Amino acid sequence: MNQELTTNPFNPVAPVKTFDEIKVSLASPERILSWSFGEIKKPETINYRTFKPERDGLFCARIFGPIKDYECLCGKYKRMKYRGVICEKCGVEVTLQKVRRERMGHIELAAPVAHIWFLKSLPSRIGTMLDMTLRDLERILYFENYVVIEPGLTDLTYGQLMTEEEFLDAQDAYGMDAFTANIGAEAIREMLAAIDLETEAEQLRADLAEATGELKPKKIIKRLKLVENFLESGNRPEWMVLTVVPVIPPELRPLVPLDGGRFATSDLNDLYRRVINRNNRLKRLIELRAPDIIIRNEKRMLQESVDALFDNGRRGRVITGANKRPLKSLSDMLKGKQGRFRQNLLGKRVDFSGRSVIVTGPELKLHQCGLPKKMALELFKPFIYSRLEAKGLSSTVKQAKKLVEKERPEVWDILDEVIREHPVMLNRAPTLHRLGIQAFEPVLIEGKAIQLHPLVCSAFNADFDGDQMAVHVPLSLEAQLEARVLMMSTNNVLSPANGAPIIVPSQDMILGLYYITLEREGLPGQGMIFGSPEEVEHALTAGTVHLHSKIQARVKQIDDEGNEIYKRYETTPGRVRLGALLPLNAKAPFELVNRLLRKKEVQQVIDTVYRYCGQKESVIFCDQIMTLGFREAFKAGISFGKDDMLIPDTKWDIVEGVRDQVKEFEQQYMDGLITQGEKYNKVVDAWSKCSDEVASEMMDEISRDRFDPDTKEQMEPNSVYMMAHSGARGSPAQMKQLGGMRGLMAKPSGEIIETPIISNFKEGLTVLEYFNSTHGARKGLADTALKTANSGYLTRRLVDVAQDCIVRLNDCGTENAITAEAAVNDGEVVASLGERVLGRVAAEDVVDPASGEVIVAKGELIDERKADLIEQSSIQSMRMRSPLTCEADEGVCAQCYGRDLARGTKVNVGEAVGIIAAQSIGEPGTQLTMRTFHIGGIAQGGQQSFQEAGQEGKIAFRNANLLENTSGEKIVMGRNMQLLIVDGEGAERASFKLGYGTKVHVAEGDKVGRGDKLFEWDPYTLPIIAEKSGVVRFADLVSGISVREETDDATGMTQKIVSDWRAAPKGSDLKPEVLIADPETGEPVRNDAGNPVTYPMSVDAILSIEDGMPISAGDVVARIPREGAKTKDITGGLPRVAELFEARRPKDHAIIAEIDGYVRFGRDYKNKRRISIEPSDETMEPVEYMVPKGKHIPVAEGDFVQKGDYIMDGNPAPHDILRIMGIEALADYLINEVQDVYRLQGVKINDKHIEVIVRQMLQKWEILDSGETTLLKGEHVDKLQFEAVNEKAIAEGRRPAQGEPILLGITKASLQTRSFISAASFQETTKVLTEASTMGKRDKLIGLKENVIVGRLIPAGTGGATQQMRRIAQERDQKVIEQRQAEAEEAAALAAPMAEDVFEDGGDMADISMPESRD
């Protein structure tokens, strides 16, 4: 596994022993001394005159080893032959200078010192161990207070703090020897040493059994955990206080002479020097028997200097160097982006690499890249030298060097030989997904720029405006093989994020392909008939027919049996030309290209060719259509001038119409019919509709077919329209700004400015409009910079949480599965069932409901054909395997994961699916963040206020609850009513959720056609509607306390608005509500359940009625305003994704009913309302919720709610979904929410990537009841550990622990991974390492990150295979060894009765010690 070091003849190194895990624990003073090669007594470093290290100083050669190889300091012994001799004059061992990198020293401290990590890294381990607060500890350590260690017979208590006076008084009162108290780290050390861990643990367990209340058990559990960790790991508590400080090897803290007699030195030397100085001074003071107070001060300073050495700035002032810069301590060396982990272990500089600017290389093949000769010569130097030597052109490396420097002709020939078939890797930063590094075969070119194939640009996200790329050379044969097989650009046609081709033409190529497939009326040669593509080419060359003429041609095709046939097609010469490039295949017929090809269609063509004709064919095809696209675009000469931007004639009419509308809204507002917020919303809506209308007029005009009046030929479409329509460049949104109207702008805060920009760029903006537009433009640019960073950080967290998710086995054999159904958003299907199950494994047989035949068998991978069958049948949902439910112990299994999207086949064992998932989710984040500003902050989207039918069918209601008001409108009164459109067979075609207060325009059983209005709602306010008729009575709606009257300055109208009554002094116990009374009796009207009809009011509700007014059922009692329209773009999107993956509880989150039952309102508590649910099932306990007063509660007393219903609106907290509705519901919620954000941007990501991340978030279980196990209540443990402990408990007949799965955010989950190395390299390094060392954690080196850090092959891909072979070999060896041992024992037993003395050393067994295999 570890690459064995090559043995140097001068320095035969023993091969590195392979290891399986790394354990970290506390170092005892004896351990530190055993590492050390000597004590450092002096603070001197080197003699500034002779530059030789001072003896016993920080660079002492006697302790750390010689400065020059095989030479002692005084020069008495030189050369190899004295190896291992210790010079009697200077005491230096004659050996390699390299040992100065590995030999450590130590400093004997004159007084113990607390280790700052265990003191200050929260929670303080020393504090927990002693059950003292951090403040008290610091008082003792920094010599402010004494602490009682042994109270004796006095009435003092153990651990009591005393000031100096109190201490002296106590000594007077009780006598000197009656009790022991001490101060400083010595006191702490004594207390820690006195702890007997086993009795302490027993005592704590006993306490825990008796403890009651909330806080006490928590505290005990914390201590118990720590004590048990110490017991298990074999650490002693007193080792957290240092008596010996280790000194790291001098070469790791070098001192470099600069010119001019100055020195550059590592900060550590300064920090060590301070420690040594203070330590020596303290020793001297103790010898001199100095007064206590001086010694104490010196001890405090020693403590501070050791603190600074370990973690500068953690406590007290930061210690600065000569130039006022804080010194870098040992902790700083590890932490952060510049620390050891991220700078040197996870990211390294690479030998044999170069970088240069990229230019386009359209004449390259897909697997090639152009490499400048200069670069190639430099990169392949060693290969050239060896080849020169082999050919006998040079006898030494020096000669070869000269030849290469002179660039002799034979060198170039050799370079060509060397480079042939030797792939190189190209990388463009930022490498956001694995396609950011691909392998190509180099082609030598003149010049200094790297040439890149145009088709791979979209994978690298590269353009040629000055981008740079790096070249890396794979050296070993294995590396070249992997580069060719796995990383070659031709092997990465499909994107791992969604399985669609990523090698797609873009921009000019698309424009060319669009142009060549155009079809126009009345061109020369229309109606001609051709017998073969060759004839068409002749006619084109002769000019008798135009590229776009409508003709008939005969094209060679292949039928399903594989025979060649000729078929006639109505087509154009251009399409025939394109069709000639298609590989002959029944599944790729000419119809594929016999249409107008836009970007989407081209992608589909490539996809089809790849799926059915194989990789080789499709790569050749891609290269050919690239060449064709470029050539045709160049020949078409499409370009545009300013007159190609058409401004519709109707623009000003539309604008005038909307202006009148807006005036009317202003007037309504003045008359007080609508509120300020409503006016704003209506105005914004009107303008955004106007803007869309102008844009669509413009698009209609620009896309209209035009005919030449003289020749009656159809003219070419408008150039701008062709570019946008084909998907080459530009978009309708940009065309709208150039030729329509610029539209509404958003302020930096995200609100929309009411006045739109009516001009477009062609007309030019007025000064005021220009000023308004600067808002959005600036926001766009600022956002871009910020979001790039945020998105990168999101990707980093995702990679960290998912890095150890690898496909480890073929099938875990689980019966669990999740249900897949089509994704519906706002009633339209955004992802069909077929799309969602494609590439998954069915968990049970899928049966066609019509015919009853099995479409997909259980355990079968669903490919495109099967997915199409599922689509055609009327199946609504099916069960499929998912990474979420996979039961593999480590990683996931291939069956649960399904298809490897980038290859189109079942995923291979060893694929790092976690990292691919993280990249697939993170990469578009950055893409999108870089793209917001192209629209320049234009406000998008007015509010939708009605829903039209998307297809024909019959109406059906679910959970119907309708009320008809006086004007005959049907109003929804229920919370979870759905409207369905069903087709003739009764299969559901669309479904809509109807919110409370929606007006429904259709009745059950109605037939509807496309575009019929189904229902409408008020998008800006949430109404409260009377369910019975009667007279209004106000309760607790006191003017000035719970109601404020707002007079609008503009209109003079007043409105009654419910204000926040809790803030008022007298309002604490009010319950503002509106009652409906019977006009005859004055009694409150009762509803069907028999409860009085009351409407509790929430803050900011606007009352629509007066006290004492008559009201009829269906009228509005009050309106609650919703937030205004905010603009939607991924700025809202990226934080939303991060929020979902971090599993944060949203502010004002929804409250979800945990059980089925009836709603009851309990007694109010301070400013919360108490809602309880009485279960319909008698055996269960009622559940209570507290809701802040003044929040609108959609349920009423006596309503029946089902488990999972919302009792309070808002975004649900994912933890609640998991707890109440289970893992599958949580997965559905997270997948849909994340997908919604990406869909808004038109980014496709496969669901399984999100599932893999969610799986990683669900690894831990929280213990609810510890049973009779060692697990503690409230502890988070791994699912595996939880199950193992319980199995053991059950086997021994004890009560198992109870637990439930919990959801951890990705940051939390990364910090709680099994591997402490991985967690430490992610964030909070000191905290992670402190915890790991007290627990004596073992890192099993399972994930990728920890293996990269310790410098091994990663256990994925080819590295995983080697690891498996090693494991098998070990198991075999083990068997052989056991067999031999058994045989030897038998032989020994036969040979001699005294087996002991025969087998003293284990015979020949002793030399075959295998490292423990890891099961």
From Swiss-Prot:
Biological processes annotated in GO: DNA-templated transcription
Binding-site residues for Zn(2+) 1, renumbered to this chain: C72, C74, C87, C90
Keyword vocabulary terms for this entry: DNA-directed RNA polymerase, Magnesium, Metal-binding, Nucleotidyltransferase, Transcription, Transferase, Zinc
InterPro entries: DNA-dir_RpoC_beta_prime, DNA-dir_RpoC_beta_prime_bact, RNA_pol_asu, RNA_pol_N, RNA_pol_Rpb1_1, RNA_pol_Rpb1_3, RNA_pol_Rpb1_3_sf, RNA_pol_Rpb1_4
GO MF annotation list: DNA binding; DNA-directed RNA polymerase activity; magnesium ion binding; zinc ion binding
Enzyme class: transferase
Entry binding sites for Mg(2+): D463, D465, D467
Record keyword Cell inner membrane present: no
Any one Gene Ontology cellular component term annotated for this protein: DNA-directed RNA polymerase complex
Required co-factors: Mg(2+); Zn(2+)
Cofactor: record remark: Binds 1 Mg(2+) ion per subunit. Binds 2 Zn(2+) ions per subunit.
EC number from the UniProt entry: 2.7.7.6
Keyword Transcription on entry: yes
Catalyzed reactions: RNA(n) + a ribonucleoside 5'-triphosphate = RNA(n+1) + diphosphate
Its job: DNA-dependent RNA polymerase catalyzes the transcription of DNA into RNA using the four ribonucleoside triphosphates as substrates.
Subunit structure: The RNAP catalytic core consists of 2 alpha, 1 beta, 1 beta' and 1 omega subunit. When a sigma factor is associated with the core the holoenzyme is formed, which can initiate transcription.
HAMAP family cross-referenced by the UniProt entry: RNApol_bact_RpoC
Family under the similarity heading: Belongs to the RNA polymerase beta' chain family.
The name this protein goes by in its record: DNA-directed RNA polymerase subunit beta'
